């Protein structure tokens, strides 16, 4: 069964992760996201809380961005604060050194620390 445009749109996170991003630019992103029917907008946690309504899209934030090399406790605190400020989803950057070095027990512990900090939020592990 082929996917419709709306089916595909609901799988997309519309992102604005430039370090100089402003609330005005995020507002434009949210307007575009609502017009396109995408799932969420993803922004840096420093932009939270957002001073406007999101309409029908969810709010995602990055965690440990962009390197993933942050300490697990820092990632967990960053994620928890973002969720407390309105984030529905957390896109956590995986520590590439651990993954590339086959240190998957560290990768798992890192993800687990963030998961435990935000049990009610959607958590995605991403590679940058």
Stretch-by-stretch model annotation:
Residues 25, 29, 78-82, 107-114:
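A general structural detector for well-ordered alpha-helical segments in enzyme core domains, enriched
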Residues 42-44, 88-94, 120-128:
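Short beta-strand segments at enzyme active-site cores
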Residues 45-67, 102-126:
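Alpha-helix-loop-beta-strand connector modules within alpha/beta enzyme cores
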């Amino acid at each position: 069964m082929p996917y419709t445009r709306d089916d595909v749109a609901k799988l997309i996170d519309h992102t604005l992760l430039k370090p100089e991003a402003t609330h005005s630019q995020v507002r434009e992103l949210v307007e575009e996201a609502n017009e396109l029917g995408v799932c969420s907008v993803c922004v840096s946690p420093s932009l939270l809380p957002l001073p406007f309504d999101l309409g029908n899209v969810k709010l995602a934030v990055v965690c440990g961005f962009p390197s993933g090399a942050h300490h697990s406790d820092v990632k967990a605190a960053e994620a928890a604060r973002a969720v407390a400020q309105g984030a529905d989803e957390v896109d956590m950057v995986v520590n590439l050194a651990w993954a590339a070095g086959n240190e998957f027990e560290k990768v798992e512990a890192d993800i687990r620390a963030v998961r435990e900090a935000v049990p009610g939020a959607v958590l995605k592990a991403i590679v940058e």
